[in-house]
């Protein structure tokens, strides 16, 4: 594995170029939610990468020395079967997916345990009120259930938080981080709000 990682370093030196440590790709623009300010809502279910295209991207990336792949969306988890298939085909890679978490269930947890190279980063906007306010009623409780499932199986996962003028105080508080740790999260991504997409507000 160390030798594989060195491929990218050697290429950087030889060709005077930068090889990415990770490659981001959108498997689909489809999503089961309709969150405020999400660009994907503009595209609906129109944009999809085929399983073979995703597989080809990973195969090409490995030749460069890239072994980390990050799924964004849309909601990548609407492609659960394909996600697991890619994990099976590339056991030497690690796959992280940003997800709203509502499609994580017991069956998928068992698949994660089996393939061992998939990690979700679940979207959370802070409190139940701010999360449901942006993502829809009941989403916060579904996220909590997904985290409980993952934690109960000892599966690693993280959180993805978009900070806005409405939630910045809450998501930067010690209480929020304590809550994430208590839920079992291993890491957190923070993104600033961009007023694009569905009913986006500039303030």
Write out the residue ranges for each language-model feature.
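Single conserved hydrophobic/aromatic residue that forms the stacking wall/gate
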Residues: 1-8, 12
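Hydrophobic packing within well-folded, soluble alpha/beta domains
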Residues: 11, 31, 35-38, 122, ...
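A C-terminal junction/extension of Radical SAM enzymes
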Residues: 193-203
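Short, flexible hinge/linker loops that cap or flank conserved catalytic cores
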Residues: 5, 15-19, 63, 89
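Radical SAM/AdoMet-radical enzyme domain recognition
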Residues: 54-71, 79-192
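Canonical Radical SAM [4Fe-4S] cluster-binding loop centered on the CxxxCxxC motif
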Residues: 17, 22-52
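Short, conserved loop/turn and helix-capping segments at secondary-structure boundaries
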Residues: 48-51, 137-140, 203
């Amino acid at each position: 594995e160390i030798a594989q990682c060195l491929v990218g370093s050697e290429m950087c030196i030889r060709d005077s170029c930068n090889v990415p440590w990770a490659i981001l790709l959108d498997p689909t623009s489809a999503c089961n939610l309709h969150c405020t300010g999400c660009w994907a809502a503009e595209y609906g279910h129109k944009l999809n990468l085929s399983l073979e295209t995703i597989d080809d991207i990973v195969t090409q990336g490995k030749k460069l020395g890239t072994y980390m792949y990050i799924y964004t969306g849309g909601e990548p988890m609407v492609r659960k079967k394909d996600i697991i298939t890619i994990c099976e085909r590339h056991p030497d890679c690690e796959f992280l997916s940003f997800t709203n978490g509502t499609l994580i269930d017991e069956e998928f947890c068992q698949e994660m345990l089996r393939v061992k190279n998939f990690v979700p980063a679940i979207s959370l906007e802070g409190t139940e009120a701010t999360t449901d306010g942006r993502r829809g009623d009941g989403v916060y409780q579904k996220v909590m259930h997904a985290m409980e499932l993952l934690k109960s199986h000892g599966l690693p996962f993280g959180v993805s938080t978009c900070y806005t003028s409405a939630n910045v105080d809450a998501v930067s508080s010690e209480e929020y981080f304590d809550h994430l740790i208590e839920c079992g999260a291993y890491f957190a991504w923070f993104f600033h709000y961009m007023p694009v997409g569905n009913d986006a507000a500039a303030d």
